[in-house]
């Protein structure tokens, strides 16, 4: 059976309610599904203060008034590094519906509008090909993070 087509809108998070819903989805995907400890999943950038300070932008994908995907861009990085995309998550029943691609396109649009030259991310090995299809290039060797193999990847605009 082919993937269904869903109307999805990607919004920048600017309320505590949307941030809470994004974090709930991340816990569902990373903690419940992948068994990552919650203390490794939620960090100091997951609050409205970090958003207001410009350290991070969170986005949510909304379909039928439900948050079905989320991700964030970290701008609080060393001066010689690109902003870091992370915590890309899509609700299990909504995968294979281009939602991840829509989220990444929105993140790239945000970065371009801010004058950034590229982005970096740490991909779980099992979804590395998703990022390669978007134009990301592998950097360095694979490594373990929270018990899962990862690969650093870069995207140049």
PLM-predicted stretches and their roles:
Residues 2-49, 53, 58, 62-66:
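Short amphipathic alpha-helix that is part of the acyltransferase structural core
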Residues 60, 65-75, 82-84, 89:
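Conserved beta-strand in the GNAT
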Residues 60-62, 152-156:
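Short, well-ordered beta-strand micro-motif
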Residues 75-85, 95, 146-150:
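A conserved beta-turn-beta hairpin within the catalytic core of GNAT-like acetyltransferases
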Residues 90, 96-109:
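Conserved acetyl-CoA-binding loop-helix of GNAT-fold acetyltransferases
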Residues 104, 111-124:
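Conserved GNAT acetyl-CoA-binding A-motif
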Residues 122, 132, 137-152:
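Conserved catalytic-core motifs of GNAT/GCN5-like acyltransferases
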């Amino acid at each position: 059976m082919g993937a269904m087509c869903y109307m999805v809108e990607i919004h920048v998070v600017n309320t505590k309610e949307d941030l809470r819903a994004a974090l709930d989805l991340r816990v569902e995907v990373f903690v419940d599904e992948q068994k990552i400890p919650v203390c490794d999943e939620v960090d100091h950038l997951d609050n409205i203060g970090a958003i207001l300070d410009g350290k991070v932008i969170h986005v949510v994908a909304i379909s039928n008034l439900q948050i079905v995907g989320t991700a964030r861009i970290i701008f609080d990085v060393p001066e010689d590094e690109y902003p870091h995309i992370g915590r890309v998550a899509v609700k299990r029943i909504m995968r294979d519906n281009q939602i991840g691609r829509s989220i990444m396109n929105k993140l790239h649009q945000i970065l371009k509008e801010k004058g950034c030259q590229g982005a970096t991310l740490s991909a779980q090995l099992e979804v590395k090909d998703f990022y390669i299809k978007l134009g990301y290039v592998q950097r360095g060797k694979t490594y373990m993070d929270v018990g899962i193999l990862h690969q650093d990847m870069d995207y140049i605009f």
